[in-house]
Amino acid sequence: MENLMIPEGYRPPLSIRETEVAIKEVKDHFERSLAKNLHLTRVSAPLFVRPESGLNDNLNGVERPVSFGIKEQNDKEVEIVHSLAKWKRYALKRYGFHSGEGLYTDMSAIRRDEDTDNLHSIYVDQWDWEKVISREERNDETLEYTVRKVYAALKETEHFMARRYNYIGEILPDDITFITSQELEDLYPECTPKEREYRYAKQKKAIFIKQIGKTLASGERHDGRAPDYDDWELNGDIIVYYPVLDTALELSSMGIRVDEAALKRQLALAGCEERAELDFQKSLLGGELPYTVGGGIGQSRICMFYLRKAHIGEVQSSIWPNEVVEEAAANGIPLL
Protein backbone atom coordinates (compact mmCIF):
# COMPACT_ATOMS: atom_id res chain seq x y z
CA MET A 1 0.00 0.00 0.00
CA GLU A 2 1.59 3.23 -1.22
CA ASN A 3 0.73 5.45 1.76
CA LEU A 4 1.38 2.90 4.52
CA MET A 5 4.79 1.52 5.46
CA ILE A 6 4.93 -1.57 7.70
CA PRO A 7 8.39 -1.97 9.29
CA GLU A 8 9.49 -5.59 9.26
CA GLY A 9 8.94 -7.23 12.64
CA TYR A 10 7.37 -4.11 14.18
CA ARG A 11 5.38 -4.58 17.37
CA PRO A 12 4.32 -1.64 19.55
CA PRO A 13 6.18 -1.90 22.86
CA LEU A 14 3.38 -0.06 24.68
CA SER A 15 -0.37 -0.69 24.82
CA ILE A 16 -2.74 2.08 23.71
CA ARG A 17 -3.35 3.10 27.32
CA GLU A 18 0.37 3.05 28.15
CA THR A 19 1.01 5.07 25.00
CA GLU A 20 -1.42 7.76 26.12
CA VAL A 21 0.42 8.09 29.44
CA ALA A 22 3.77 8.28 27.66
CA ILE A 23 2.48 10.93 25.22
CA LYS A 24 1.69 13.23 28.13
CA GLU A 25 5.13 12.63 29.63
CA VAL A 26 6.80 13.58 26.35
CA LYS A 27 4.70 16.70 25.89
CA ASP A 28 5.02 17.93 29.47
CA HIS A 29 8.79 17.50 29.59
CA PHE A 30 9.53 18.95 26.16
CA GLU A 31 7.24 21.93 26.71
CA ARG A 32 9.02 22.81 29.95
CA SER A 33 12.46 22.40 28.37
CA LEU A 34 11.58 24.53 25.35
CA ALA A 35 10.07 27.32 27.46
CA LYS A 36 13.11 27.35 29.77
CA ASN A 37 15.71 27.29 26.97
CA LEU A 38 14.09 30.09 24.95
CA HIS A 39 12.49 32.15 27.77
CA LEU A 40 8.94 31.64 26.49
CA THR A 41 5.54 32.28 28.10
CA ARG A 42 2.56 30.13 27.20
CA VAL A 43 -0.42 31.97 25.66
CA SER A 44 -3.82 31.00 24.28
CA ALA A 45 -4.17 30.76 20.51
CA PRO A 46 -6.96 31.00 17.93
CA LEU A 47 -8.37 28.00 16.10
CA PHE A 48 -9.69 30.21 13.28
CA VAL A 49 -8.99 33.66 11.80
CA ARG A 50 -10.61 36.03 9.30
CA PRO A 51 -9.28 35.65 5.71
CA GLU A 52 -8.84 39.41 5.27
CA SER A 53 -6.58 39.59 8.32
CA GLY A 54 -3.75 37.93 6.38
CA LEU A 55 -2.90 35.94 9.52
CA ASN A 56 -3.41 32.45 8.13
CA ASP A 57 -0.43 30.49 6.84
CA ASN A 58 -0.73 30.07 3.06
CA LEU A 59 1.81 27.21 3.17
CA ASN A 60 2.76 26.50 -0.46
CA GLY A 61 -0.03 28.69 -1.81
CA VAL A 62 -2.25 25.89 -3.11
CA GLU A 63 -3.64 24.27 0.04
CA ARG A 64 -7.30 25.09 0.73
CA PRO A 65 -8.18 26.16 4.28
CA VAL A 66 -11.28 24.78 5.96
CA SER A 67 -13.74 27.67 6.27
CA PHE A 68 -17.21 28.28 7.65
CA GLY A 69 -19.66 31.13 8.20
CA ILE A 70 -20.61 32.51 11.63
CA LYS A 71 -24.40 32.73 11.90
CA GLU A 72 -24.39 35.57 14.44
CA GLN A 73 -22.27 37.69 12.08
CA ASN A 74 -24.34 37.26 8.90
CA ASP A 75 -22.35 34.16 7.93
CA LYS A 76 -19.10 36.13 7.92
CA GLU A 77 -16.45 33.64 6.80
CA VAL A 78 -13.56 32.50 8.97
CA GLU A 79 -10.78 29.98 8.26
CA ILE A 80 -9.35 27.19 10.40
CA VAL A 81 -5.66 27.99 10.77
CA HIS A 82 -2.94 26.09 8.89
CA SER A 83 -0.39 27.39 11.38
CA LEU A 84 0.12 30.43 13.61
CA ALA A 85 3.32 31.63 11.92
CA LYS A 86 2.01 35.16 11.38
CA TRP A 87 -0.46 35.41 14.26
CA LYS A 88 2.36 34.97 16.80
CA ARG A 89 4.21 38.05 15.57
CA TYR A 90 1.07 40.11 15.85
CA ALA A 91 0.47 38.70 19.36
CA LEU A 92 3.98 39.60 20.55
CA LYS A 93 3.23 43.25 19.86
CA ARG A 94 -0.29 43.19 21.24
CA TYR A 95 0.74 41.44 24.46
CA GLY A 96 3.69 43.75 25.09
CA PHE A 97 6.64 41.36 24.73
CA HIS A 98 10.13 42.89 24.56
CA SER A 99 13.45 41.86 23.00
CA GLY A 100 14.63 38.53 24.40
CA GLU A 101 11.10 37.52 25.43
CA GLY A 102 8.80 35.16 23.59
CA LEU A 103 5.63 33.11 23.60
CA TYR A 104 4.55 29.61 22.74
CA THR A 105 1.19 28.01 22.27
CA ASP A 106 -0.49 24.69 21.58
CA MET A 107 -1.72 24.89 18.00
CA SER A 108 -4.27 22.62 16.39
CA ALA A 109 -4.85 22.84 12.64
CA ILE A 110 -6.62 21.02 9.83
CA ARG A 111 -4.87 20.58 6.49
CA ARG A 112 -7.55 19.11 4.27
CA ASP A 113 -5.28 18.74 1.22
CA GLU A 114 -2.52 16.81 3.01
CA ASP A 115 -1.46 13.49 1.45
CA THR A 116 -1.46 11.17 4.46
CA ASP A 117 1.08 8.46 5.22
CA ASN A 118 3.06 7.21 8.23
CA LEU A 119 4.30 10.75 8.94
CA HIS A 120 1.50 12.99 7.64
CA SER A 121 -2.05 13.57 8.87
CA ILE A 122 -4.82 16.03 8.03
CA TYR A 123 -4.72 16.96 11.73
CA VAL A 124 -1.67 18.99 12.74
CA ASP A 125 -0.70 19.67 16.35
CA GLN A 126 2.41 21.62 17.19
CA TRP A 127 4.04 23.99 19.60
CA ASP A 128 4.11 27.30 17.80
CA TRP A 129 6.64 29.68 19.33
CA GLU A 130 7.95 33.16 18.58
CA LYS A 131 10.53 35.43 20.21
CA VAL A 132 11.34 39.13 19.85
CA ILE A 133 14.83 40.00 18.59
CA SER A 134 16.52 43.23 17.54
CA ARG A 135 17.16 44.22 13.93
CA GLU A 136 20.88 43.62 14.56
CA GLU A 137 20.12 40.02 15.59
CA ARG A 138 18.62 39.18 12.22
CA ASN A 139 21.62 37.09 11.18
CA ASP A 140 22.91 33.56 10.76
CA GLU A 141 24.56 33.54 14.18
CA THR A 142 21.22 34.17 15.91
CA LEU A 143 19.56 31.48 13.81
CA GLU A 144 22.13 28.81 14.67
CA TYR A 145 22.16 29.79 18.36
CA THR A 146 18.38 29.41 18.50
CA VAL A 147 18.43 26.10 16.63
CA ARG A 148 20.88 24.75 19.20
CA LYS A 149 18.56 25.83 22.03
CA VAL A 150 15.64 23.97 20.43
CA TYR A 151 17.86 20.95 19.80
CA ALA A 152 18.97 20.99 23.44
CA ALA A 153 15.31 20.64 24.47
CA LEU A 154 14.96 17.70 22.08
CA LYS A 155 18.06 16.05 23.56
CA GLU A 156 16.91 16.65 27.14
CA THR A 157 13.54 15.09 26.39
CA GLU A 158 15.04 12.01 24.75
CA HIS A 159 17.32 11.52 27.77
CA PHE A 160 14.32 11.81 30.10
CA MET A 161 12.21 9.33 28.12
CA ALA A 162 15.09 6.86 27.75
CA ARG A 163 15.37 6.74 31.55
CA ARG A 164 11.61 6.27 31.92
CA TYR A 165 11.33 3.51 29.28
CA ASN A 166 14.18 1.05 28.82
CA TYR A 167 13.26 0.16 25.23
CA ILE A 168 13.72 3.69 23.91
CA GLY A 169 17.46 4.30 24.14
CA GLU A 170 19.19 7.51 23.03
CA ILE A 171 19.90 7.94 19.32
CA LEU A 172 20.26 11.71 18.90
CA PRO A 173 23.89 12.89 18.52
CA ASP A 174 25.35 15.45 20.92
CA ASP A 175 25.40 18.16 18.25
CA ILE A 176 23.25 19.09 15.28
CA THR A 177 24.91 19.57 11.86
CA PHE A 178 24.19 22.68 9.77
CA ILE A 179 24.10 22.72 5.96
CA THR A 180 22.47 25.07 3.43
CA SER A 181 19.98 23.80 0.87
CA GLN A 182 22.45 24.78 -1.90
CA GLU A 183 25.32 22.89 -0.24
CA LEU A 184 23.03 19.88 0.03
CA GLU A 185 22.12 20.11 -3.67
CA ASP A 186 25.81 20.39 -4.57
CA LEU A 187 26.54 17.32 -2.43
CA TYR A 188 23.82 15.18 -4.04
CA PRO A 189 23.04 16.82 -7.41
CA GLU A 190 21.45 13.65 -8.80
CA CYS A 191 18.95 13.33 -5.93
CA THR A 192 15.55 14.85 -5.23
CA PRO A 193 15.30 17.14 -2.18
CA LYS A 194 13.73 14.36 -0.09
CA GLU A 195 16.44 11.91 -1.13
CA ARG A 196 19.09 14.46 -0.14
CA GLU A 197 17.49 14.89 3.27
CA TYR A 198 17.44 11.12 3.78
CA ARG A 199 21.04 10.54 2.76
CA TYR A 200 22.48 13.39 4.81
CA ALA A 201 20.28 12.75 7.86
CA LYS A 202 21.21 9.06 7.86
CA GLN A 203 24.88 10.06 7.83
CA LYS A 204 24.74 12.84 10.47
CA LYS A 205 21.65 11.69 12.48
CA ALA A 206 20.47 15.26 13.23
CA ILE A 207 20.69 18.13 10.72
CA PHE A 208 19.43 21.65 10.15
CA ILE A 209 18.94 22.51 6.49
CA LYS A 210 19.19 26.28 6.03
CA GLN A 211 17.72 28.63 3.42
CA ILE A 212 14.52 26.82 2.45
CA GLY A 213 12.16 28.55 0.02
CA LYS A 214 14.74 30.24 -2.22
CA THR A 215 15.52 29.07 -5.75
CA LEU A 216 18.66 26.95 -6.02
CA ALA A 217 21.28 26.82 -8.79
CA SER A 218 19.28 24.03 -10.44
CA GLY A 219 16.32 26.38 -10.81
CA GLU A 220 14.32 24.37 -8.27
CA ARG A 221 13.50 25.05 -4.62
CA HIS A 222 14.41 22.59 -1.88
CA ASP A 223 10.87 23.00 -0.52
CA GLY A 224 8.09 25.55 -0.55
CA ARG A 225 7.68 28.32 2.02
CA ALA A 226 5.12 31.10 2.14
CA PRO A 227 6.78 34.44 1.31
CA ASP A 228 5.41 36.44 4.24
CA TYR A 229 6.83 34.92 7.40
CA ASP A 230 10.25 33.20 7.08
CA ASP A 231 13.17 35.07 5.56
CA TRP A 232 14.30 32.47 3.00
CA GLU A 233 17.95 33.37 3.69
CA LEU A 234 17.58 32.86 7.46
CA ASN A 235 15.37 29.81 8.01
CA GLY A 236 15.41 26.04 7.85
CA ASP A 237 14.26 22.64 9.12
CA ILE A 238 15.42 20.40 11.97
CA ILE A 239 15.51 16.87 10.56
CA VAL A 240 16.58 13.65 12.30
CA TYR A 241 17.20 10.15 11.04
CA TYR A 242 14.45 7.80 12.22
CA PRO A 243 15.57 4.15 12.14
CA VAL A 244 12.12 2.66 12.83
CA LEU A 245 11.03 3.73 9.34
CA ASP A 246 14.53 4.23 7.88
CA THR A 247 13.59 7.77 6.92
CA ALA A 248 14.41 11.43 7.45
CA LEU A 249 11.94 12.90 9.94
CA GLU A 250 11.31 16.65 10.07
CA LEU A 251 10.62 17.72 13.66
CA SER A 252 10.63 21.49 13.30
CA SER A 253 10.48 24.28 10.75
CA MET A 254 11.78 27.61 12.01
CA GLY A 255 13.54 30.80 11.08
CA ILE A 256 14.14 34.48 11.46
CA ARG A 257 11.09 36.26 10.11
CA VAL A 258 10.94 38.71 7.22
CA ASP A 259 11.66 42.37 7.73
CA GLU A 260 10.17 45.02 5.46
CA ALA A 261 12.74 44.56 2.68
CA ALA A 262 12.62 40.75 2.73
CA LEU A 263 8.82 40.76 2.62
CA LYS A 264 8.73 43.02 -0.44
CA ARG A 265 11.37 40.92 -2.20
CA GLN A 266 9.75 37.57 -1.45
CA LEU A 267 6.22 38.70 -2.35
CA ALA A 268 7.60 39.79 -5.73
CA LEU A 269 9.49 36.52 -6.23
CA ALA A 270 6.36 34.54 -5.35
CA GLY A 271 4.18 36.62 -7.68
CA CYS A 272 1.72 37.54 -4.95
CA GLU A 273 2.40 41.22 -4.31
CA GLU A 274 -1.33 41.74 -3.75
CA ARG A 275 -0.89 40.23 -0.28
CA ALA A 276 0.83 43.46 0.72
CA GLU A 277 -2.67 44.95 1.07
CA LEU A 278 -3.75 42.49 3.79
CA ASP A 279 -3.83 43.77 7.37
CA PHE A 280 -0.86 41.78 8.73
CA GLN A 281 1.38 42.50 5.77
CA LYS A 282 0.51 46.22 5.81
CA SER A 283 1.42 46.39 9.50
CA LEU A 284 4.73 44.66 8.82
CA LEU A 285 5.62 46.88 5.87
CA GLY A 286 4.72 49.89 7.99
CA GLY A 287 7.26 48.91 10.64
CA GLU A 288 4.57 48.29 13.26
CA LEU A 289 5.57 44.73 14.21
CA PRO A 290 8.64 43.51 16.12
CA TYR A 291 11.51 41.63 14.50
CA THR A 292 11.26 37.98 15.52
CA VAL A 293 12.54 34.44 15.27
CA GLY A 294 10.10 31.57 15.58
CA GLY A 295 8.94 28.18 14.46
CA GLY A 296 6.70 25.20 14.87
CA ILE A 297 7.54 21.86 16.47
CA GLY A 298 5.31 18.90 15.67
CA GLN A 299 3.82 17.43 18.84
CA SER A 300 2.73 14.16 17.28
CA ARG A 301 6.00 13.96 15.35
CA ILE A 302 8.15 14.14 18.47
CA CYS A 303 5.86 11.75 20.37
CA MET A 304 6.16 9.30 17.48
CA PHE A 305 9.94 9.74 17.46
CA TYR A 306 10.53 9.35 21.20
CA LEU A 307 8.12 6.42 21.59
CA ARG A 308 9.57 4.75 18.46
CA LYS A 309 6.17 4.38 16.78
CA ALA A 310 5.68 3.26 13.19
CA HIS A 311 2.72 5.54 12.39
CA ILE A 312 1.73 9.01 13.49
CA GLY A 313 -1.79 7.65 14.00
CA GLU A 314 -0.46 5.73 17.00
CA VAL A 315 0.01 9.01 18.88
CA GLN A 316 -2.86 11.18 17.59
CA SER A 317 -6.52 10.65 16.81
CA SER A 318 -7.35 11.48 13.20
CA ILE A 319 -9.18 10.14 10.14
CA TRP A 320 -7.47 7.66 7.81
CA PRO A 321 -8.60 5.77 4.69
CA ASN A 322 -10.43 2.58 5.68
CA GLU A 323 -7.92 0.38 3.88
CA VAL A 324 -5.06 1.99 5.84
CA VAL A 325 -6.81 1.36 9.17
CA GLU A 326 -7.50 -2.27 8.23
CA GLU A 327 -3.99 -2.95 6.92
CA ALA A 328 -2.39 -1.29 9.95
CA ALA A 329 -4.53 -3.33 12.37
CA ALA A 330 -3.72 -6.54 10.49
CA ASN A 331 -0.03 -5.80 11.05
CA GLY A 332 -0.32 -4.95 14.74
CA ILE A 333 -0.34 -1.16 14.39
CA PRO A 334 -3.26 0.28 16.40
CA LEU A 335 -4.33 3.70 15.07
CA LEU A 336 -6.05 5.86 17.68
List the model feature ranges, each with a label.
Residues 105-195:
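Extended, charged alpha-beta segments that form solvent-exposed binding/catalytic grooves
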Residues 75, 101, 124, 204, ...:
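Short connector loops at helix/strand junctions that flank enzyme active sites
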Residues 18-25, 29, 138-145, 149, ...:
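Generic recognition of stable, solvent-exposed alpha-helical segments in well-folded globular domains
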Residues 108-110, 181-336:
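A translation/RNA-centric and nucleic-acid-associated enzymatic feature enriched
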Residues 2-120, 128-132:
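Class II aminoacyl-tRNA synthetase-like tRNA-binding/catalytic domains
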Residues 50-57, 171-179, 321:
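N-terminal pre-domains immediately preceding structured catalytic cores
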